[in-house]
Amino acid sequence: MAGARPLEGTLRGDGRRFGLVASRFNGTLVDQLLGGAVDCLSRHGASPEAIEVVRVPGAWEIPVALEWLAGSGRFDALLALGVVLRGETPHFEFICGECSRGAARVADRHGVPVAFGVLTCDTPEQAAARAGGKAGNKGWEAALAALEMADLRARLTHPD
């Protein structure tokens, strides 16, 4: 890439609006993801008024709430937050697949970044490690992606 300078987003939250959709199922773990995401956005300049949190029953309902938020035109980026744990039936695969596909469809349809912070884990211990434990907080990481993509979107669609 000699001579080429890639265009990347920055981690600026000031002046941007973020919509977070968080499931209530596995609520203790999701609350940790949500706390990490809100903390990250705030530390990077997003005001409390610019962060809107919508709670839905479970991961299955996340995509439709993302669709509603994206369709409102009020947000620079969206975040999906949830925890799905593998059980004894194929239900896990159905829920995880449709949640991720639905989030991607919303981003494609509306051109609004959707950061995916839905944990799909085999055990509660794996989820706890990723929701603020030894593997970090994936809610915080999703918020970083949302910040960067919101800025990149603005730079690409409204160049100064």
What are these regions (language model features)?
Residues E8-P57:
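Glycine-rich phosphate/diphosphate-binding loop of Rossmann-like nucleotide-binding domains
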Residues G27, S42-S47, E67-R74, A104-R109, ...:
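Generic secondary-structure signature for well-ordered alpha-helical cores
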Residues E61, A65-G102:
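Glycine-rich phosphate-binding loop
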